[in-house]
């Protein structure tokens, strides 16, 4: 059985509604309602926060000051995303996820987390949602400012559990990130709620982990 790399948002944690709400508040606050949010969100919803905010700044003609972009990238999470999760007590992982973790542990199959989230969100995932029960925080790969893109994140996530991404199964929901997993070298991908027939590396599509065929892992 191959080692496994999990994405988080949209894969282990179904938060599309939370992210859209948080981004809507953030973009409206920055632009004072002058930007067509739905149009820009369609194009940039799967990108890293910094890239999304940078694009908004460009649209508005604002100077691309790194500290200001970082401020808004973090504010989207700490002011809006975190608040929504806590006010609505959103902390349940995707159905079947914890059962899969238990199975992997019992069978001594290495696994790790690879997320484009920033540190502030990783803190929420571990301390509020409870990922600390299942993952080694020191080994996960996230947007700590050292990665150029998710391609390098995938490779690092695999290396930190003693393997290579070419040897792993990746669970991922975003078609953009699935393409990056392929570019990183992964040829064994299980897609969550998304499918592209042109990506031959996708071996199964599931709505959640209760539909997973363990025999293909």
What are these regions (language model features)?
Residues 97-127:
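Substrate-recognition element of Asp-dependent hydrolases with the DxDx(T/V) motif
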Residues 12, 111, 170-171:
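Conserved SAM-binding loop
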Residues 96-100, 153-156:
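Well-ordered alpha-helical segments embedded in enzymatic catalytic cores
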């Amino acid at each position: 059985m191959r080692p496994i790399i999990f994405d988080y948002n949209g894969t282990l944690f179904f938060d599309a509604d939370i992210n859209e709400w948080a981004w809507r508040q953030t973009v409206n606050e920055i632009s004072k309602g002058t930007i067509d949010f739905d149009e820009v969100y369609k194009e940039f919803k799967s990108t890293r926060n910094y890239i999304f905010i940078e694009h908004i700044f460009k649209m508005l003609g604002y100077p691309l000051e790194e500290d200001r972009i970082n401020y808004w990238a973090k504010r989207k999470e700490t002011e809006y995303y975190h608040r929504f999760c806590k006010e609505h007590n959103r902390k349940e992982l995707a159905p079947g996820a914890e059962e899969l973790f238990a199975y992997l542990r019992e069978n001594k199959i290495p696994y790790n987390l690879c997320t484009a989230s920033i540190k502030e969100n990783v803190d929420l995932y571990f301390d509020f949602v409870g990922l600390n029960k299942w993952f080694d925080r020191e080994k996960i790969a996230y947007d700590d400012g050292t990665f150029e893109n998710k391609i390098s994140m995938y490779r690092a996530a695999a290396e930190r559990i003693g393997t290579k991404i070419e040897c792993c199964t990746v669970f991922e929901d975003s078609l953009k990130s699935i393409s990056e997993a392929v570019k990183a070298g992964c040829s064994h991908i299980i897609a969550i709620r998304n499918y592209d027939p042109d990506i031959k590396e996708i071996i199964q599509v599931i709505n959640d982990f209760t539909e997973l065929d363990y025999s293909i892992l």
